[in-house]
Regions:
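Macrodomain-like recognition of ADP-ribose-binding/processing modules
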Residues: 1-244, 248-313, 343
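Short coil-to-beta transition motif at edge beta-strands of beta-rich domains
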Residues: 315-334
Length: 400
C-alpha cells in the first residue's frame, strides 16, 4: 500500500509526542507521502479516491525575479491598514480565498539558496511546512538540478540562489491538499489553490542594541532589508495580487530583530507606491519553536503594537457538525435549544460565487438556512447590543 493511502494523521500526532527526538524523520515521511500523492495524481481517503490535478501553469507560470521591479498598480484602493492575526498562514489564506474578496497570495519566507529550505531533511520552518502541504515543489524545483528526481523539468534560464536584494519567485495556483501539522498533516477531502511569493529574509544579520534595549539591523543592512520588502510588494503588484498574507519576515530561525522588521514593513507600506496598491494586507503569525520573544512579548504582540492593532486576532475555523449559538440567545432564549444551530454543509452561490454556510435550527420547526460565510465571521455590534457578552454573531459551543 502506498504511504499516502495509509496515512493516519492521528497516529502521526501520537508518534510525534512519543518520539519528539525523531521529529525530522516524521516530517520526512510527511513530505514523502506528499510527493507520492502529487506524482501519482491522486490519494485515497478511505474508499474515496481524491483526484489531484496540479494547475497547468504551476510550472510554466512561475516567474523568477532577479532585478529591481517597478510595476504600476492595476487598481487603486483606499489606504490599506495592515491586520495582525494570530494564526497559521494557510488557514488565514483559506479564509480569505473563501471570502472571494480578491486575488490572494501568501508570502513564503524562503531560503535564498534552496527551494523548500530543508524540507527534504525534515526541517520545520514555514517554507518546509508549505512544501509538505502542497504541490509547491513543482513550481520551485525547476530552478535546481535535483528537480529532475521529482519529474520537474529544469528551467534553462533561471537558477537558485535568488538575488540578495531583488530576488523572488511568483508561483500561481499552488494546490493545497494537506492539513496543518498540529492535526498530523491529514489529506484533505477538498483541495484548494492559492498563489505564493517567495522572498528570502536576511539570514542571521548583524544587529545593534539601542540604549532602550531594542535590537535593530546595522545601518548598512537596512537598504537590503527594505529592498526585500519592496520586492514582495512589487511582485504582488506585477501579478495582480489584491490580498497579501505576510508573516514575521525572518524573525524566527533567521533571527531578524522583530520590532525593526515590523517598523520597516509599516514604513514601506505607507510609501506612495504601496499605500493604495492592495485591498487587504494581513500578517499571519504563528507562535512556534522558531519564534522569538522580545521583552517577554510574542511576535504577534510586537507586530500588533507596531501596526497599532487593538488586539491580535485569532483565525476562527468552522466545521460541518459544529453547533453554534446566535448572540440573541443571551437575551431571548426561552428553552435550552433556542438559538442553537448545527452547521450541515458549506456551499457556493451559483450566481455570485459567494461562500455560504448551510445550517439548521435545533428547535422546532427545525428550519434550514443558507447565509454568507462572512456573517458567521462577523462580530456583534456592541454599540447596538451593549448587553451582549458574546463576541461573534455565531459562536461554536467549543469557543464559549
Amino acid at each position: 500500500m502506498r504511504l499516502c493511502d495509509a496515512w493516519d494523521a492521528h497516529a502521526w500526532v501520537q508518534e510525534r509526542k512519543k518520539r519528539f527526538a525523531y521529529f525530522r524523520e516524521l516530517r520526512r515521511k510527511v513530505f514523502a507521502a506528499t510527493i507520492e500523492a502529487s506524482m501519482n495524481g491522486y490519494y485515497m481517503l478511505g474508499d474515496e479516491r481524491i483526484e489531484l490535478q496540479s494547475a497547468s501553469d504551476i510550472t510554466s507560470g512561475t516567474k523568477m525575479y532577479c532585478e529591481e521591479l517597478v510595476p504600476q498598480p492595476m487598481q487603486s484602493y483606499a489606504d490599506v491598514k495592515a491586520e495582525v492575526v494570530n494564526g497559521d498562514c494557510l488557514a488565514v489564506a483559506k479564509t480569505l480565498v473563501d471570502a472571494k474578496i480578491g486575488k490572494v497570495a501568501v508570502l513564503n519566507m524562503a531560503s535564498r539558496t534552496s527551494p523548500g529550505g530543508g524540507v527534504i531533511s525534515g526541517a520545520g520552518a514555514q517554507e518546509e511546512y508549505l512544501f509538505r502541504c502542497s504541490d509547491y515543489y513543482k513550481s520551485l524545483y525547476q530552478f535546481v538540478d535535483y528537480g529532475a528526481q521529482y519529474n520537474v523539468e529544469r528551467n534553462e534560464e533561471y537558477s537558485y540562489p535568488m538575488d540578495r536584494d531583488f530576488g523572488g519567485c511568483y508561483s500561481p495556483n499552488v494546490t493545497i491538499f494537506r492539513g496543518v501539522e498540529e492535526d498530523g498533516y491529514p489529506f484533505l477531502a477538498k483541495t484548494w489553490q492559492v498563489n505564493f511569493i517567495a522572498v528570502a529574509a536576511l539570514n542571521r544579520p548583524e544587529t545593534v542594541c539601542l540604549p532602550n534595549g531594542s535590537m535593530r539591523l546595522v545601518d548598512y543592512l537596512v537598504p537590503t532589508a527594505k529592498n526585500k520588502i519592496r520586492t514582495i510588494f512589487n511582485i504582488a503588484i506585477d501579478n495582480g495580487v489584491q490580498v497579501l498574507v505576510l508573516g514575521a519576515f525572518g524573525c524566527g530561525a533567521y533571527q531578524n530583530p522583530p520590532v525593526h522588521i515590523a517598523q520597516l514593513f509599516k514604513e514601506i507600506l505607507a510609501e506612495p507606491e504601496y499605500r493604495n496598491a492592495f485591498k487587504k494586507v494581513v500578517f499571519a503569525i504563528k507562535q512556534d519553536h522558531n519564534s522569538v520573544s522580545v521583552n517577554n512579548k510574542t511576535l504577534v504582540e510586537v507586530f500588533s503594537e507596531v501596526f497599532g492593532s487593538e488586539a491580535a486576532k485569532t483565525v476562527r475555523k468552522l466545521h460541518v457538525g459544529d453547533v453554534v449559538r446566535h448572540f440573541k440567545r443571551e437575551t431571548e432564549a426561552s428553552s435550552s435549544t433556542d438559538y442553537l444551530y448545527k452547521i450541515v454543509a458549506f456551499a457556493e452561490h451559483t450566481e455570485t460565487g459567494e461562500s455560504l454556510v448551510i445550517y439548521q435550527s435545533l428547535y422546532p420547526p427545525f428550519n434550514i438556512w443558507a447565509r454568507p460565510y462572512d456573517m458567521f465571521m462577523s462580530e456583534v455590534d456592541k454599540e447596538k447590543y451593549p448587553e451582549i457578552k458574546q463576541k461573534y454573531r455565531f459562536e461554536a459551543l467549543s469557543e464559549l
